[in-house]
Amino acid sequence: MIPMKRVHFEYIQIHLASPERIRKWGERTLSNGEVVGEVTRSETINYRTLKPEMDGLFCERIFGPVKDWECHCGQYKRVRYNTDLKNDIVCERCGVEVTESGVRRHRMGHIKLAAPVTHVWYLKGIPSYISIILGLPRKEVEGIVYYNNYETTGSKEIARFIKDKQLLERKDRKIIDQSFFSLDEESELFSGAQAIQTMLSSLDLKTTAQNIREELAATEDWSEEEEDRLRKKRNKLIKRLKIINHFLATGAKPEWMILSILPVLPPDLRPMVQLDGGQFATSDLNDLYRRVINRNNRLSKLNTMLAPEIVVRSEKRMLQEAVDALIDNGKRGRQALVGSNKIPLKSLSDIIKGKQGRFRQNLLGKRVDYSGRSVIVVGPQLKLHQCGLPKEMAIELFQPFVIHNLINQGLANNIKAAKRKLQNNDPSIWEVLKQVIQGHPVLLNRAPTLHRLGIQAFEPILVEGRAIQLHPLVCPAFNADFDGDQMAVHIPLSLEAQTEARLLMLASSNLLSPATGQPIIAPSQDMILGCYYLTTENPKFQIERGHYFSTLKDAVMAYEQKRIHLHSYIWVRFQGRIDTKSTQEEPIEIRIEESGFCSTIYRRYQYRSFKNKKELKTAATPFYNSENAYLMMNKKKMSIPQKPSLESNNLSLTATATATATATATATATATATATATATATNANDHYFVQYVRTTPGRILFNQVIHECLELNEIHP
């Protein structure tokens, strides 16, 4: 095994590569002094011998042997001759280095292009860096690159550009030097990507940046009308200055956006596999590379033959299109190249971009141990910090912990016996699993993880089924919904990881967005609708009033028994302070009943007075209807209406004139008791006062939900 050299680095920087660096990637010198690396033939393998063709896309001399320690001709075969990298053996016949076949995964080659070509990302991308740095429209630059404006051998497009105002300085600029654009109609130097390369190489970045800064400084003296008219031009100058500053900061040169040497990927990254029927399945990159090599070789041959200019230009354009298809097939509306099955070929960009690309699929989305994946469904019964974990998944993820506990508790003698219990679904494993997951958080992640809240910690709750249950309020942080989304589960193994997950990553501790500081957990959609329905007032059920309850639980129980509606007005005995808008609120009604009960009724609450504790206990029955009690009163002793009203807009009193004075005194005593707002109080005459609040069963249920959320979501690690 070849020893691997460890390289420690702090960061990775991606920038333009120079032609020398690209050549260095794909070129190396063998121990016999031979320099290899250039791919000159488009053949892949010999279909008779099934061996790679020399100097082709799978050449063993360039990329390394197909089999370990075996050369192409077979002189060195199946023997590990030497492990010293300084004295590698090279076959005298075929020139293949005798080493491991794993080198074919990282050894690159290169293609020396017969004519420069532009990189399609920098030409047709948004923004087009080549057109911005040159200060020309993108369509004009493309016209030069693809020869769309050339009909004869004369360079009409170049002549037009020389006269164009965009290539002239304002006053003190001179016409472009002869070395920049030759006026010779017969010269092919100024057509295609070679013309763009000449323009970029002659560009002085520091001088251009200074000129742009001076021009931007002059715009500060513009009037408002001129500024509105020339704002678009100012924005272009700023954009051009930013790109030039990036080139100056990184040390890259603009002409490196033009390719003269094309790198070739290692063959194991674009494999060719033989099928059962004798046919071969190959990567689309091989077809794209083959097209580039064929056109490049044909162009080289035309140059040596001194072919007509129009033929050479046509071949250069075809080479440019072939390289464009290799880098990004179908970029910016171009018709994509298709294979034999009429399906567009996958280019280098298609391989690395998107959800199925190399970065997100293979580098960021690797499969790891102690992890699982399943569809998420809503779990409204869960707390904010909880998630429902399927039993089938939990027993697999926590298997080492379960086995350890089975042995420690004496339920299994060894690991083999513990695994047998797991395979047989022994009932004892579920109790052990509950003990294991108690206090052991799990991590839930939904790809793509675009910010810190894309992965959070939860306390697992064992559930039936095969779907992960999630609290609906944590969905905005994951950008998840319940239409088939999947989430991954990861198990923190060490105590340090578990502690960090509980302290820093628990869902109930991440309520604010790290980007904006605004709450990221807020009720929405059907939750808001449900809260509104619980707390709304329904006039249809306002006539169902007069029900008295001693506790909130009794009111909820009556609702569950369907004795009252969700929106029915009820009176509930309440211990606590009542806040009202007015400190001098007048009672709506004062009622004196035959039994001696005196009720002072306000809009949202009331007080009832009793002579002794016995009457107080009688009034504190779980379900008491004041209207039914009123019908049982002795109507002969008191002149009162047949059906008293709980609320009256004109503040009318339902007691007789004789009872009015007593009621007024009672109301005064009641108003004094309002400050304390206790459930039971006494006055100077030893009358007992009970406080009631008017509400609905829906509001009681709403308050219970809010209190449960506030109390149970407080996690103490």
From Swiss-Prot:
The protein's Enzyme Commission number: 2.7.7.6
Chief localization: plastid
Superkingdom of the source species: Eukaryota
Spans traversing the lipid bilayer: none
Cofactor binding notes: Binds 1 Mg(2+) ion per subunit. Binds 1 Zn(2+) ion per subunit.
GO molecular function annotation: DNA binding; DNA-directed RNA polymerase activity; magnesium ion binding; zinc ion binding
A Pfam family recorded for this sequence: RNA_pol_Rpb1_1
Keywords per UniProt: Chloroplast, DNA-directed RNA polymerase, Magnesium, Metal-binding, Nucleotidyltransferase, Plastid, Transcription, Transferase, Zinc
GO CC entries: chloroplast; DNA-directed RNA polymerase complex; mitochondrion
GO BP terms, alphabetized: DNA-templated transcription
Cysteines engaged in disulfide bonds, as pairs: none
Cofactor: Mg(2+); Zn(2+)
Residues reported in the UniProt entry to bind Mg(2+): 481, 483, 485
Catalytic activity: RNA(n) + a ribonucleoside 5'-triphosphate = RNA(n+1) + diphosphate
Subcellular location field: Plastid, Chloroplast
Family per similarity comment: Belongs to the RNA polymerase beta' chain family. RpoC1 subfamily.
HAMAP family in UniProt: RNApol_bact_RpoC1 (MF_01323)
Assembly, per entry: In plastids the minimal PEP RNA polymerase catalytic core is composed of four subunits: alpha, beta, beta', and beta''. When a (nuclear-encoded) sigma factor is associated with the core the holoenzyme is formed, which can initiate transcription.
Name listed for the protein in its UniProt record: DNA-directed RNA polymerase subunit beta'
Organism of derivation: Chlorokybus atmophyticus
Source taxonomy: Eukaryota, Viridiplantae, Streptophyta, Chlorokybophyceae, Chlorokybales
